[in-house]
């Protein structure tokens, strides 16, 4: 008889937390509810994480690692400015769509009433993404000698706001309004506007 695979309890706790964020939109997650979902005592949770904030930080680490590593691939593999921007935004939207519970963290909805440093960490992730967008837009100016009519920082902020708005709609609709719906058509319009500037 084969031995059952050993469960990484820490990962299992984070998976349960993400699932609870998805299945309980708008509700606060308590350690008691999480322990019940995981099937352990609250004390057992605290053997793996010293606090609930550290559990959320575990998910935020996953978000940051997943997004930024893929953004770096986009930066390495794609050289066209508009395609880079499109792929970066699509990555963010697809990631949110595939991870509805985690999209509540990106949106900040699940962090209301939690430690301030958690909201700061999410803010830092979005700042890094915006910095990548600025870099992409500035490189176009350097490569082609022709920039945009608006400052690249303003354009990068606008592009990120589009993605953040789509994620916000996704959370507000309780995951019914997918962030990628109509993005292709919207991107065609956005790209036309950017290239006219």
Swiss-Prot record:
Example of a GO biological process term: cell division
**Species for this entry:** Shewanella woodyi (strain ATCC 51908 / MS32)
Pfam families with a match to the protein in the record: SlmA-like_C (PF22276), TetR_N (PF00440)
The organism sits in which domain of life?
Bacteria
Family statement drawn from the similarity comment of this UniProt entry? Belongs to the nucleoid occlusion factor SlmA family.
Question: What residue ranges does this record give for the DNA-binding region?
Answer: 30-49
This entry carries the following GO cellular component terms, namely: bacterial nucleoid; cytoplasm
Function comment:
Required for nucleoid occlusion (NO) phenomenon, which prevents Z-ring formation and cell division over the nucleoid. Acts as a DNA-associated cell division inhibitor that binds simultaneously chromosomal DNA and FtsZ, and disrupts the assembly of FtsZ polymers. SlmA-DNA-binding sequences (SBS) are dispersed on non-Ter regions of the chromosome, preventing FtsZ polymerization at these regions.
Domain HTH tetR-type intervals? 7-67
The record's note on quaternary structure and interaction partners says: Homodimer. Interacts with FtsZ.
Location comes to: Cytoplasm, Nucleoid
NCBIfam families attached to this UniProt entry: PRK09480.1
- The protein's name in its UniProt record: Nucleoid occlusion factor SlmA
Please name the InterPro entries in this protein's record.
Homeodomain-like_sf, HTH-type_Tx_Regulator, HTH_TetR, NO_SlmA, SlmA-like_C
Q: Which gene encodes it?
A: slmA
Q: Which UniProt keywords apply?
A: Cell cycle, Cell division, Cytoplasm, DNA-binding
Instruction: Tell me which PROSITE patterns the record gives.
Output: HTH_TETR_2 (PS50977)
The organism that produces this protein has a lineage beginning with: Bacteria, Pseudomonadati, Pseudomonadota, Gammaproteobacteria, Alteromonadales
Entry's Gene Ontology molecular function annotations: sequence-specific DNA binding
